[in-house]
Structure formats: structure tokens, C-alpha cells
Regions:
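N-terminal nucleotide-binding beta1-loop-alpha1 segment
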Residues: 1-22
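Acidic/Gly/His-enriched mid-domain segments of enzyme catalytic cores or analogous surface patches
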Residues: 8, 31-33, 42-126, 131-133
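Short, hydrophobic beta-strand segments that form beta-sheet elements in well-ordered domains
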Residues: 15-19, 36-41, 54-61, 208-209
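Structural motif
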Residues: 18-22, 104-106, 133, 210-212
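Short N-terminal binding/cap micro-motifs at the start of the first secondary-structure element
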Residues: 24-28, 46, 216-217
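A short secondary-structure junction signal
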Residues: 27-29, 111-115, 140-143, 167-169
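Class I SAM-dependent methyltransferase SAM-binding "motif I" and its flanking Rossmann-like core
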Residues: 120, 124-149, 154
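Long, charged alpha-helical interface segments
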Residues: 140-229
Length: 229
């Protein structure tokens, strides 16, 4: 029976969150086996199809179908309402130092925009990674550093307004730049050094977008930001 309890899951390790967008979970093997798995509503089907048992399913339960055959060990948290998305409902209840999301990119564009809106509205500073078939992206607040192959694409997307004071390792430096949607963004840059550093000024945070093959490097950077290195 679904619960409406809103007691958060307080975790000391990263969490894996699976959404309902099509995904083969490529890259999930890079996550440690002890990281707990959560499902956002219909993401339950993807998790079970890949032999992953979520600790909990969170959402408005409009996409999960019949629940009576589920393992009773899976907690069902039913949150009604259309004023927030299942992704937002999950992030509000999963208090982990890092969240790695699969199944939130690559399907409907309006859903992807809703995901970015949620990341822009978060008040905390934890890194959040989203894994897609072609891209991986990470929400960042503050400075960050990456160890990357030379000549790959490197994009920055502001979550509101974000300034940068200094950068290293990019073909087109973002030193002194203030990014804002509709005015200035930082897509389609290129890595020219194996170490890329970004020193951020005041702002609302930003997304770092890389090719999907760079998930290992993105995870490494995220674990450092989450003080889990």
C-alpha cells in the first residue's frame, strides 16, 4: 500500500535515481554497488527490468501500473499534485551528497526542460549528474575541476544567472563572463588541456555538459565536490 509519509531518506553515500525516460542504464556499472537505488514513478519498470530493486518508488504513481505484485520491501511513497514533477518530488526526499540520475534525458523535450527547471530551483549545493545516451551533465554550484581527454566538447549552461572569474583548459576561456539564458551561454566549447578548471563567481549554478563517454571523469569530479573522494 503506498504511503504518503514525507520522511526524507538521509544518506551518507550517493544515490542512484531512475526515471521513466527510455534508458538502458549504460554507465550504471560505474556506480558503487552499495549506492541505494530509487525510482521516480515509472522508472520502477526500468529498474526491475534491469534486475535492480529500488529502496523506494516516489511520485504521483500515475505510471507504475499494478503495485500488488511488488516486493513488499520496496517502499511506495505516493505524492499527489501536479505543481511539481516526480523528479522534484524525489530530490526533495532523497537527502544524499550526490544523486546520479538515469532516465531523465533523451525523451520528451518538455520533460528535459522541466528537469532543468527543477535543478535551477534547488536551494542546496550538492552535485547532481544526469546520464543520457549521448550526453552526461552535472549540476554545479561553485568551483569545479575535471580531468578530461583533449579535444572533446565541453558545454556550460547557466541555471539562471552565473558568473565565472577564471577558467583553464578551454579553447574559449570564460574568464569574467556572466552567463544568462537569453543573453550568454557557453555551449560547444572545446577541451585543450587534460585539466579543466572553472572558478565561479556569484550565481545560481550551472550545468556542465559532456559526451556520455566522459561519465567516469564526471563522477570523479562529483565525488570530489561531495567530499566523498
Amino acid at each position: 500500500m503506498p504511503s504518503t509519509a514525507l520522511t526524507p531518506f538521509v544518506l551518507s553515500k550517493p544515490a542512484i535515481l531512475i526515471g521513466a525516460a527510455p534508458t538502458d542504464l549504460a554507465g550504471i556499472e560505474l556506480c558503487a554497488p552499495e549506492w541505494p537505488v530509487f525510482a521516480a514513478d515509472g522508472g520502477l519498470h526500468t529498474a526491475l527490468a534491469c534486475n535492480l530493486q529500488p529502496r523506494a518508488v516516489i511520485g504521483d504513481m500515475d505510471s507504475v501500473g499494478a503495485l500488488d505484485q511488488l516486493d513488499p520491501a520496496i517502499e511506495l511513497i505516493h505524492q499527489k499534485g501536479q505543481e511539481d514533477t516526480d523528479f522534484e518530488k524525489c530530490l526533495n526526499l532523497i537527502h544524499a551528497p550526490l544523486v546520479v540520475g538515469f532516465g531523465f534525458l533523451g525523451a520528451r523535450h518538455d520533460h528535459v526542460l522541466a528537469v532543468l527547471h527543477t535543478l535551477a530551483s534547488l536551494s542546496d549545493s550538492r552535485p547532481i549528474i544526469l546520464v543520457g545516451q549521448d550526453d552526461v551533465m552535472m549540476r554545479v554550484r561553485g568551483d569545479c575541476q575535471f580531468h578530461l581527454p583533449i579535444d572533446i566538447r565541453f558545454s556550460l549552461w547557466p541555471l539562471g544567472q552565473q558568473s565565472f572569474t577564471q577558467s583553464e583548459g578551454l579553447a574559449w576561456p570564460v574568464d569574467g563572463m556572466t552567463m544568462q539564458i537569453g543573453k550568454q551561454t557557453g555551449t560547444s566549447n572545446r577541451v585543450i588541456d587534460t585539466t579543466v578548471k572553472l572558478q565561479a563567481g556569484p550565481g545560481d549554478g550551472y550545468m556542465v555538459i559532456l559526451p556520455s563517454a566522459c561519465l567516469p571523469q564526471l563522477l570523479q569530479a562529483a565525488l570530489y565536490l561531495a567530499n566523498l573522494h
